[in-house]
Amino acid sequence: MKKVPLNCENCGNRNYNVPKKEGSATRLTLKKYCPRCNAHTVHKESK
């Protein structure tokens, strides 16, 4: 498993590092809490 960072869609802040299987072709998108936005927002996997 590889840890990948998740960026907030609204502010671009890197808030979370989550494990992901290597060899997975799709990018991860999760709805998580962003302390900078003070709300639950969509977080996308960054490179």
UniProtKB/Swiss-Prot annotation:
One of its GO terms (molecular function) is structural constituent of ribosome. GO terms for cellular component: cytoplasm; ribonucleoprotein complex; ribosome. One of its GO terms (biological process) is translation. Keywords: Ribonucleoprotein, Ribosomal protein. The keyword Ribonucleoprotein applies. PROSITE patterns: RIBOSOMAL_L33. InterPro entries: Ribosomal_bL33, Ribosomal_bL33_CS, Ribosomal_bL33_sf, Ribosomal_zn-bd. Belongs to the bacterial ribosomal protein bL33 family. NCBIfam families: PRK00504.1 (NF001764), rpmG_bact (TIGR01023). This is Large ribosomal subunit protein bL33C. The lineage of its organism: Bacteria, Bacillati, Bacillota, Bacilli, Bacillales. The gene is rpmG3.
